[in-house]
Amino acid sequence: AMVPLFSRMGHFPYQVPTAVVSKTLDFGKFRIQDMTDYMRDTIKVWDELGFDPDCICTGFVLSEEQVELIGDYIRSRKPRMDEIQNVDNGRLVMVDPIMADGGKLYNGIGMERVAAMRKLVSYSDVMVPNMTEAGFLTGICPGRERASASELRELVDGLHKLSGKSVVITSAQDSETD
């Protein structure tokens, strides 16, 4: 979903799948093909070709091993990205910690994935969790879809402690209004 947006902004997205999923996880029965080996091989090819991304975006991540692989990739490029980052060229790391919605973790995702996502969002310049993911990442209002304005501020502050940079919470609903 991010590719058209970043393409329109003038970036050339390189894509590498983390998993192939037979159906969304909410049906309870699904098949996931782990693509970690493919990711590792793809990154090696990118390095051999001298690819130098101006933007790194992550979405669904299957395992701690993938978090480590992505983290290593980001760290190997981040000093250069920080050196040239400015508003005009948009060099950044964006993390969408896809793991939960509707007040609960997706089927097949446990607290070990939440811990791995905390590590991954620490590399981000921009993180875009939904309300449920923000709650699980921070431990503030976990499992809730609505929060008061003060709880939402607390959630944003908690997310800032994880990355210290920009935070956008999607699908947040103020519990004090209808």
Listing of model-derived features with the role each one plays in the protein:
Residues 2-95, 99-107:
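Conserved N-terminal subdomain of the carbohydrate kinase-like
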Residues 107-178:
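Conserved phosphate/ATP/ADP-binding segment of small-molecule kinases
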